[in-house]
Amino acid sequence: MNLVIVQYKISFVHLFKNKNMKYPKKLIFFIAMLVSVSPLLAQISVSGNVIDQDGQPIPGVTILDQEDNSNGTVTDFDGAFTINIPSDGTLSVSFIGYVTQNILVSGQTNINVTLQENVSALDEVVITGYGSQIKKSDLTGSISSISSEDFESQPLIRVDQALQARAAGVAVTQTSGAPGAGYKIRIRGANSITGNNNPLYVVDGLVIGNINNINASDISSMEVLKDASATAIYGNRGANGVVLITTKSGSKGKAKIQVDSFFGTSEVVQRIPVMSPAQYAAGVNLRDGVETISQSRISELSAGGGADWQDYFFRSAPFSNIVVSANGGSEDVDYYISANNYKAQATVINQDFNRLNFRTNLNAQLNDKLKVGINNFISRSENTGARANLATGIAWDMNTPPRDSNGNYNSAPLVSGVGNGSPMPLLGPENNRVENISDQLISSVYANYNITDNITLNISAGVEKIDLTNSRYTSSEVNGVTEAVVRDQQGVRFQNTNRLTYKNDNPDHAFQADIVHEQQSFEMNFREATASSFFSNSTNFKELSLAGIQNTDSGNSNEKLESFLARINYSLYDKYLFTASVRAKGSS
């Protein structure tokens, strides 16, 4: 699929001239619009390899056109890449843990790059789970860290997109071409053939079941815990790896409002090659050995009759993403607020996606010892349209026009024995409609209390509420029987975490110990109604009472988990590192 993106960025900066953050006497708006248009320069194909200081190839390195960030690629397992770029353009070569290089193309068609390790990155602080922070140089486990600076210039829709080609050892593949479709994340390979291989997602310390609706622009950083040492603190839930997500907080100083947006279209540029209707008709005669289709009909098809069903399946699909955010604060209080709307059509007709979300993060330093905060997130996504059977439709009889002379779907071939119907009913929402709605609420609070200079108590609690409604309607035009299904699911997840931390930053004997107590509960309820044998096709899944056959079902499930955890990190002379953790849990 070919993706064409035009990006606009608008920033509004509020300047406050008033002490103690009272209501301002003067409010100054500064508006700046940057419209980035790539110049129409000669494009050349540039190939090369990316290696490290030891001459080993580096897979997954991001290669971008510095002037057009929507034009990019990643290196393969051999460190090789190919990209089309203006002859006087600049390549940006980046990978986690290495220094980014910007290379002038200057008409070169072969460019090899050697990346240098980013030594200063070892002093960066990373989150290792349950709010614990240590320097990268003190890590004994395998952790990949990604900050918002690594992807904020990219037109990302989903959080899991940010991991693609940015976290070493993490395989990210898209599950579907449908708008809003998720990504398959594999951190420690496929541990199960039929079971769940997805990693555990933790957002601001709260275990989350669904990250599909979270806005990528709200992310401050992500840490990926990969090996057994890093994931042990989460027990068997971390068997497939753990992704720790930290959302943005406000910055001290003047309030700032920012609007970011991008727009574009998606198109299928390489269709399945098929014969023309006239070639298909001639092939039928050749297959049958007789003139099944008359020469006069073949002449009509050559003049423009018949149909290539792909012309009816595919379309140019527009999409747009708009993010409005505000942040600011004083010495003691900071805030971050954002709203996001993403709309997209699928390249297959009659399929649409719409997502809205809103976030507020507030932190307050009440005194020298106590800091509190609250994070709220609410979202709704709607995926509507018709299910299209492309594989079957493409192979359908091309001699049959989509509709008959009365404008109805043509479900019978013109010539007996040639084809057996029309795929058009599979595309019409009046005959085959699907509607999936997801509502999500995430709310969490925390309190940090410094008992002494070395001992800190952290108490946090959070809840995630998910409501899912999946509806499907299929008329008798599709499979001979009118059917409808409506399924509602409600899930509530609660978590309370209490952590006591002792930390000594002595350069010769750095020591940190954590003791954690955690309680979790998850409850899921569902209701399902099915209906068939409707008295008329002019119905949908909202009129189940008009069906001759009706059935209902319901159920619920409950899970509870209580855990105790102890973890020690010790660094001797900044050379010898020791990490140990033990976890005990009970579940019901």
Q: Language model features by range: what are they?
A:
Residues 121, 137, 251-306, 346-351, ...:
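Surface-exposed loop/interface segments of Gram-negative outer-membrane beta-barrel transport/assembly proteins
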Residues 261, 339-343, 578-588:
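Transmembrane beta-strand segments that form the barrel wall of outer-membrane beta-barrel proteins
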Residues 75, 318, 492, 556-560, ...:
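Short secondary-structure boundary/capping elements
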Residues 1-359, 364-367, 371-379, 442, ...:
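Short, small/polar-rich motifs associated with maturation and membrane association
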Residues 249, 329-332, 364-368, 449-455, ...:
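Outer-membrane beta-barrel strand-turn architecture
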Residues 443-449, 463:
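Alpha-helical support elements that line or immediately flank enzyme active sites
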Residues 185, 243, 324, 358-360, ...:
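Membrane-embedded beta-strands of outer-membrane beta-barrel proteins
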